[in-house]
Amino acid sequence: MNKFIFLFIFLFISCKTFYTGSFDQPNLNTEQPEELSSIVSKWEDGKRTTGKSNEFEWWYFDTKLDNGAILVCYFYKVHFLQDRYFIGLNYNDEDEDIFLLKYFNKNEVQFSTDSCDVIMGNNYIRGNLDEYEIKLDPKDFEGFGVELFLKSSLKPYRPKDGIIKAGDDFFAWLAAVPNGSTKGKIIIDGTKKNVNGDGYHDHNWGNTPLQKLFDSWSWFRGKVGDYTIIAAELNLSDKRGGYNVPILYIGGQDTILTNRFGDNGIYTQYTNLINNLYPKKNEPLFSSIKLLTEDGI
């Protein structure tokens, strides 16, 4: 019995270490990379990983259509225990609530390093920071498909170089299209509907599983009048120092009201603790989060 208990404890510790990493991990770097030009180049939205173990990358798109429907899709590549390539989609309107994943073999996918040009089977997302095409083949998604065009109305955004580093481990983010207009077709069971709306596209990549860097994060995008807001807070794990990293961007077509990141005059305020909803062992969660800047924006 004692041998069994010892073996169980050993396996538990081993699995925990395997999942979240070693107990000795570098803290968040005090200075984050700032080597790129403030002007984003289209190669930055191309493939940024090489396929090394633990790397991952995805290209994300969402749109809120004028009829109230919401579409989210993401083209994903991961290199953990094995190489995996897939597309995920969510579509919701008053009649449909669709969530689907489609996996592809390595010989069915292509990626460009010059710009966003991601092909998985007969599906793709491609563009040049200004205009994008997104196609999902109904044959791959149980009769659901899209043929959409996204036209950016704002310049691309990233905080500094868009890279959050802890030692050599990192997670990176580029908001290639902070806001834009969407038009095209939605296909449901052979019926095509012309649609219009507004859309967003970003690109994420890194070289270590996210649970080894973060406990959680919050992310928001929206519009107030002519201004687009992108806000986030990254909550690093205790092994990485336990820091909370806020991000706030507010911009219009010709003006950026604020662009703040990390300790650059931006603060987070939580109110309205949520009680009696989540397990007590969970971290505290709040229904109201405010991002405050030192200049009052």
Region locations from a protein language model:
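Structured soluble/peripheral alpha/beta segments that form catalytic or ligand/cofactor-binding pockets
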Residues: 17-297
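Sec-dependent N-terminal signal peptides
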Residues: 4-13
